[in-house]
Amino acid sequence: LECEICTAPGLECNSWTKTCDANQDTCVTFQTEVIKAPVSFTFISKSCGTSDTCALNYVQTSPHNKLTHKSQRTCCTGEECKTLPPPVLEHKVNQPDGLQCPGCFGLSTKDCTEHLVSCRGPENQCLSITGKEFGFIFRALSYKGCATESLCSLFEKRFWNVLEDVEVDFKCTPALPKSSQ
């Protein structure tokens, strides 16, 4: 299987073609929006992937009350990829859903200072990630925040194994109502 590979701001990217690894059986296109109210940043990404994650086409997470990351994706193979329109994200602001989680984000560290985050829209899980050895990008990562069940399922399927030598520990627990914390 060959797939286009690229990442760029906006809705289109200039890609090159890559032969996927043996365990990768689909091409994936992500449309991602990072919202730091009132500003939002959109980018597109194309890569090889595994078809067992295709049903998890919408994921969302918030590590901070003013920061939300959401991503819509489509999967395709062969000629279908040439005609399939890119995934479309709804540009709506999800309102708080009455749940909350600890939230924080730290690069180059496995610890970060937590604060409570109000979950939004479909986010009903608390996600905690620690990772190390992200190649040349950074040595460590610590992340906590609200997340959709679909994002937790993606982590359960170890979707990051397309990255070389990445060690990631993650845990998802149900988000709690605001009054109970």
UniProtKB/Swiss-Prot annotation:
Q: Does the keyword Secreted apply?
A: yes
Q: Which Gene3D superfamilies match?
A: CD59 (2.10.60.10)
Keyword annotations = Disulfide bond, Phospholipase A2 inhibitor, Secreted
Pfam assignment, any one: UPAR_LY6
A single GO cellular-component term from the record reads: extracellular region
- The record's disulfide annotation reads 3-27, 6-13, 20-48, 54-75, 76-81, 101-126, 119-146, 152-172
> What SUPFAM superfamilies would the database entry show?
Snake toxin-like
CDD domains xrefs: TFP_LU_ECD_PINLYP_rpt2
Where in or outside the cell it occurs: the entry states: Secreted
Function summary? Strongly inhibits its own venom PLA2 and all other PLA2s tested including Elapid, Crotalid and Viperid venom PLA2s, as well as honeybee PLA2s.
Q: Its quaternary structure?
A: Heterotrimer of 2 subunits A and 1 subunit B.
Q: What is this protein called?
A: Phospholipase A2 inhibitor gamma subunit B
